[in-house]
């Protein structure tokens, strides 16, 4: 596999093209098509889609009935066939063609000098400004072979064009109105296996119609788990009674990958790389997709499959799509605000229901002054407010150990006071020292020994205190560990931070926690003094504070052990949501993180923390992730306490999104990294 080649990584480059139409002049239109086709060829495009009735113009009306025009269209189709012999893209071109006793509005699919097939428009609008049935016949029930000059090609709406040398590229074509009907041809085609759905459109523009198209194209891509490539007619079409905007767009599974400006001058293209591997993954996971196929077997099975060899380009041709650095954290400010609002309230409502079900016990929580416990505390405070319970029912304990920092301890103390919760400090050092002495640990004899036992004794003592305090006060222990820590197994099992009575952070990744706290500050959920402490928490480095510093080295850093959470959350999302192989994850990570100046950052993200990572670093931390996720940490997830799912990226509950054996080897994933991911 060529690691740097996007086609090798499951991507297919597609283009939606529009041009200056010359109505009634097929030769001029064909020249425009070929210019755009050559540009697409140079850019490594696999599929290029043009507007409806590309060669004649859409607004030609009764001129469609002229033999001279129809013959000229056929001649230019043949010219394009010859001229495209050495071009990479599959060309999807609109043309009025004669078949039997009628004229059909068709898409001619051409590749490397061959007409692969001809797809007629199924549904002809004859309402409001449209009068297509006056000149044209519907093709919804046609399933035959059409002649274009001396060429013969399959004809019908039931054609799938599959690349024999590129797993995942299966093209279907529909035309304009076809996507406006309740059951469009593309829906049946997707069930039959199409992954790229093309729409050649005329679609004159009126106020609001562009948004209608966007909704329909987005919905089609989401429902069909497919890419939807849309190209509308634009400049040059007749404005006798109508106007045209040349809208082009590419959607993938509900996500907009590319869109051109509207009302463009001249020739324009929207180009993007569609992830067919992602689409196939989604279909495999969503069993109801195949159930729907079985239900509509009679419509799906007759589809004809035409194979061709694409012969995609080799080497690094870039990646023409945005890869979000933080897949759990959208860079769009409006979306981020909405996500934070929903995530926070999912957590609050989850805790509210648990409190109601238990007849309002006290909430016992260990507060360290770090991100996770801080966020859990403000969720608990809001839940109490909404349920009309006093915040004093939250029993917050700070449990300083051998290396608890002054700043984190101060953050915890000030936050609890500002919120008005019941706050107590219990120093665990005496208890931890006693346990270390009882088990004969070298630290109890004055030796420097900061091993895993030293760490876990502290973590275990803290949790033991919290559970006994919950017993004493009639409360429940509120867990604070987040999704990222669960994915990496960065927790102490059993009598440790892995266990609680209810964990509201279990579905929230570390990278999102920071933005949730920022959102809480920005949306003024609490008083000004609370906001000041929350900002101080955000400015503190992530550390479990279990191992002392020697005075010169930095305090124990979690990210130095398990990797940057930005990278590990990226990997976790790709595994949970799509099940991608490590080399695909490395490829995506490299495109997302190799250059801090490319792509968008979430709003408010600190400038000094906008880092980049080399492929060597990405490879190293991916190996750590794979080892910990697949081989080391599943036993901790198999015994998770309850907690709400938050992100569309997934969760790790063994009762929900992630069910896996606790005794599995990570060998095949590690081997794939060694084999397929270069170091530079």
Swiss-Prot record:
Pathway where it operates: Cofactor biosynthesis; NAD(+) biosynthesis; NAD(+) from deamido-NAD(+) (L-Gln route): step 1/1
MF (Gene Ontology): ATP binding; glutaminase activity; NAD+ synthase (glutamine-hydrolyzing) activity; NAD+ synthase activity
Chain sites annotated for binding deamido-NAD(+): 456, 485, 490-493, 636
Gene Ontology CC terms, in alphabetical order: cytoplasm
CDD domains from the UniProt entry: GAT_Gln-NAD-synth, NAD_synthase
Binding site residues for ATP: 366-373, 480
Entry's EC annotation: 6.3.5.1
Keywords: ATP-binding, Ligase, NAD, Nucleotide-binding
Sequence similarity: In the C-terminal section; belongs to the NAD synthetase family.
Name the UniProt record assigns to this protein: Glutamine-dependent NAD(+) synthetase
The organism of origin for this protein: Mycobacterium leprae (strain TN)
Gene responsible for this protein: nadE
């Amino acid at each position: 596999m060529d690691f740097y080649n996007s086609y090798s990584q499951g991507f297919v480059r597609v283009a939606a093209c529009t041009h200056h139409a010359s109505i009634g002049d097929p030769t001029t239109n064909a020249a425009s098509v070929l210019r755009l086709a050559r540009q697409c060829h140079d850019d490594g495009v696999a599929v290029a889609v043009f507007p409806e009735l590309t060669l004649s113009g859409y607004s030609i009306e009764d001129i469609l009935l002229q033999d001279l025009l129809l013959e000229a269209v056929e001649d230019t189709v043949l010219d394009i066939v010859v001229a495209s012999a050495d071009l990479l893209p599959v060309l999807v071109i609109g043309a009025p063609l004669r078949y039997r006793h009628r004229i059909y509005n068709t898409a001619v699919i051409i590749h490397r000098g061959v007409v692969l097939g001809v797809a007629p428009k199924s549904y002809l609008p004859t309402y409001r400004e449209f009068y297509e049935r006056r000149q044209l016949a519907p093709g919804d029930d046609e399933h035959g072979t059409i002649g274009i000059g001396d060429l013969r090609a399959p004809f019908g709406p039931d054609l799938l064009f599959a690349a024999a040398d590129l797993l995942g590229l299966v093209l279907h074509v529909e035309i304009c109105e076809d996507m406006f009907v309740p059951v469009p041809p593309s829906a049946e085609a997707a069930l039959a296996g199409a992954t790229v759905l093309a729409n050649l459109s005329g679609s004159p523009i009126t106020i609001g119609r562009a948004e209608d198209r966007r909704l329909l194209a987005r919905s089609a891509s989401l429902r069909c788990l497919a890419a939807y490539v849309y190209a509308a007619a634009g400049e040059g079409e007749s404005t006798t009674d109508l106007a045209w905007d040349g809208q082009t767009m590419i959607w993938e599974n509900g996500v907009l990958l590319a869109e051109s400006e509207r009302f463009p001058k001249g020739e324009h293209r929207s180009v993007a790389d569609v992830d067919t591997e992602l689409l196939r993954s989604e279909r495999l996971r969503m069993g109801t997709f195949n159930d729907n196929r079985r239900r509509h077997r009679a419509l799906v099975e007759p589809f004809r499959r035409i194979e061709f060899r694409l012969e995609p380009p080799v080497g690094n041709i870039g990646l023409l799509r945005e890869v979000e650095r933080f897949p759990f954290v959208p860079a769009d400010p409006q979306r981020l605000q909405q996500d934070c609002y929903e995530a926070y309230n999912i957590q609050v409502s989850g805790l509210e229901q648990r409190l109601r079900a238990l007849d309002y016990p006290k909430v016992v929580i260990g507060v360290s002054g770090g991100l996770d416990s801080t966020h859990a505390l403000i969720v608990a405070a809001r839940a109490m407010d909404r349920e009309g319970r006093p915040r004093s029912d939250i029993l917050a304990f700070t449990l300083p150990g051998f290396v608890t920092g002054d700043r984190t301890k101060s953050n915890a103390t000030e936050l609890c006071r500002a919120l008005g919760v019941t706050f107590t400090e219990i120093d665990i050092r005496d208890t931890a020292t006693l346990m270390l002495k009882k088990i004969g640990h070298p630290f109890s004899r004055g030796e420097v020994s900061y091993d895993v036992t030293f760490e876990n004794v502290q973590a275990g003592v803290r949790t033991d205190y919290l559970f006994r305090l919950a017993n004493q006060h009639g409360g429940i222990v509120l867990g604070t560990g987040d999704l990222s820590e669960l994915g990496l197994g960065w927790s102490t099992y059993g009598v440790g931070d892995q266990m609680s009575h209810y964990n509201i952070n279990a579905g929230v990744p570390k990278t999102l926690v920071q933005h949730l706290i920022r959102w809480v500050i920005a949306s003024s959920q609490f008083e000004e003094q609370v906001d000041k402490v929350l900002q101080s928490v955000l400015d503190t480095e992530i550390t479990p504070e279990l191992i002392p510093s020697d005075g010169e080295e930095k305090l124990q850093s979690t990210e130095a052990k398990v990797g940057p959470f930005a990278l590990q959350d990226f990997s976790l999302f790709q595994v949970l949501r799509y099940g991608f192989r490590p080399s695909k994850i490395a490829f995506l990570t490299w495109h997302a993180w190799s250059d801090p100046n490319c792509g968008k950052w979430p709003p408010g993200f600190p400038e000094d923390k906008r880092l980049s990572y080399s492929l060597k670093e990405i490879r190293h931390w991916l190996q750590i992730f794979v080892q910990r996720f697949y081989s080391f940490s599943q036993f901790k997830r198999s015994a998770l306490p309850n907690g709400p799912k938050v992100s569309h990226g997934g969760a790790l509950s063994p009762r929900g999104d992630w069910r896996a054996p606790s005794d599995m080897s990570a060998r095949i994933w590690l081997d794939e990294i060694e084999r397929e991911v270069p170091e530079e």
